[in-house]
Structures are given as C-alpha cells and as structure tokens.
Amino acid sequence: MGICASSMEGEKTNTDINLSIEKERKKKHNEVKLLLLGAGESGKSTISKQMKIIHQSGYSNEERKEFKPIITRNILDNMRVLLDGMGRLGMTIDPSNSDAAVMIKELTSLQASIVTDCWGELNEDQGKKIKALWTDPGVKQAMRRANEFSTLPDSAPYFFDSIDRMTSPVYIPTDQDILHTRVMTRGVHETNFEIGKIKFRLVDVGGQRSERKKWLSCFDDVTAVVFCVALSEYDLLLYEDNSTNRMLESLRVFSDVCNSWFVNTPIILFLNKSDLFREKIKHVDLSETFPEYKGGRDYERASNYIKERFWQINKTEQKAIYSHITCATDTNNIRVVFEAVKDIIFTQCVMKAGLYS
C-alpha cells in the first residue's frame, strides 16, 4: 500500500508539473514582450509614459502630484546649466536679474534629496524670477548656443515657457508636463497593458552606457525590439563623455542589437523627436555629422538619409527593419504608430507560430 500510495503521489506531482508548464506555455502564447532599447536621451521613457496614457487609465491626480518635485528639479537644473554656460561663453545677465540668478545657484547647490523634499513646489515669486531670467537676452543667447557647452535637455524651453502655470498654487501636472519630464532611467521598468486578449509587456532599460550591462537580463522571450533614435541629436555629444556624437553612438548600438543580440527578432525603429529635428535641420546641416550627405537642409531628405543609414546596418537579408517617424510627446502620433506596431507584431506571430488565430 505504501508503495502504491507513493507511486500515485508521484504521478500526481508529475501531472501538476505538466499542467503548470502547459499553463505557463499558454500564458506566454498570449503575451507580447516588447524590449525598448536605444541610447540615452532617445525618448524611450516617454514612449512608456504614452502607453500608460493610451492603453491604461492614464495618471491619477495623486500620481500627477508625484511629478511636481521632478518638474521642479528639471526647471532649476536647466536654468543652472544655462547660467553656467553663460559664464563659459563670457556672457552676462541683466543686473536686474542678479538676485534671480543667485536664487537658482543657491537652490541647485543644495543636495538633490534636500531640494526635492523642500522645494517640491516652486512658489509664484520664484516663478517670476525664473521667468525674468528666461526673458533675459543673455539667457536666450545661451539657449541658442547650448550645444557648445552642455547637453541641455530639449524639454527646457517647454518648462520655462510654462513657468507661470507651473508655479500657481493650484498647479497639477498635465499629461504634456509629465511627458516632458526628464529623469535618467536606471534599472529595468515594465509597463503592462492589454489590447484585446493579448497582454503586452513593454520593458524599458536605461540607455546610458553604464546601464547597458543590464540589457542582457531582459533578452529572454522577446517578441520584438523597439529601438529609439533621437533624430534631432545628430549634432550633440553623449551625456556620459561629452566627446562621442550621439547619432554615431546610436548607429553603433543598433548594429549590436540588429546583428548580434537579436538576429532573428523583429526590430521596429522609432526615429524620434521629429518635431525638434524639423526645426533644427533648417539651421544645422546634417553634413556636419555625415560629410557624405548632400541633401541640404531639407527635412524629408535628411530624415530619409538617417533612416537608410540604420537600414544599411542590417546584415540579415531575410529580416525586415520596420521604421516609423515619431514624436514621443505627441499622444495622437504614438497612438497611430503603435497601432501599426501592433499589426506588425501580430502578423509576425501568426506567420511564425499561428499563436493568435
């Protein structure tokens, strides 16, 4: 009896294990894992925020309030960068704005944790001083020449232009405010949502060089890679070393992703920050980064040239690179683009295994 009972228990255990394996297999069949990769400042985290807005319930009032200290840091840090840049370029501010400049330097000299706790909200008086600085001719000139002295976030003008609203006592961050915030991504962050009966896992990993060693831990069971490139940063240098061109770094990283790490995985290329690129190309020729480029300061020619540079990297003939021009802060644009991405992924899955019949 003891032997029979033991045998039956063993069979039950095996059955439970098999059922568990089958359940997990079916779960994975109904799950799409998108790995969001790209160099730093390419807009990956903004894409993740858009998925929460579009495919989840968006941000609650409490969640919006949590962004206020981040917005404060962005405003203060960005203005400090401009003031320091003025010093490097030998510029001066209007004497009437001296107190405002001192205020910025004092606040940003505090440790980040103290500033976040004590200055989670800027008051109206501080807002007026920041607004005065933003309209200062010297600060405006430094803004135009920012690429000469720093990697100033491209969202800086957005926050300065909105300073009155953001320092109101009743201020609650909007979707656009949240989308424009900049916090360096560290570690791995997941955004989960459903479209129909299919579960999506969007995995965002930090893009700075120090964060890329964490990418390997996310490579299992990837359905497709979404690779983000900032079109507008073709003339800027990396935050990490201030000597490597950002576009050339993106090309190098894309080569590793396409030809080494994900040879058999669909890759969707987001050529991001198209709005900023459209304006910049009018003033900064793409040939400064790519001397062989002869298309002049034409948006369509320049964006197509960059797209083709990435396409040419692919060494696997049977693998297509799907590309989209994107503006990560434009919710309507990302909604339309992601519909196309969804169709690409579903088609690939059907062709490969008939999972979503």
UniProtKB/Swiss-Prot annotation:
Cofactor: Mg(2+)
Keywords, alphabetical: GTP-binding, Hydrolase, Lipoprotein, Magnesium, Metal-binding, Myristate, Nucleotide-binding, Palmitate, Phosphoprotein, Transducer
Residues that, per the record, bind GTP: E41, S42, G43, K44, S45, T46, D154, L179, T185, G207, N272, K273, D275, A328
Region entry G5 motif, spans: 326-331
N-myristoyl glycine lipid attachment residues: G2
Chain spans, region G2 motif: 177-185
Family (UniProt): Belongs to the G-alpha family.
Subunit text: G proteins are composed of 3 units; alpha, beta and gamma. The alpha chain contains the guanine nucleotide binding site. Interacts with the RAP guanine nucleotide exchange factor glfB.
Protein name: Guanine nucleotide-binding protein alpha-2 subunit
Organism: Dictyostelium discoideum
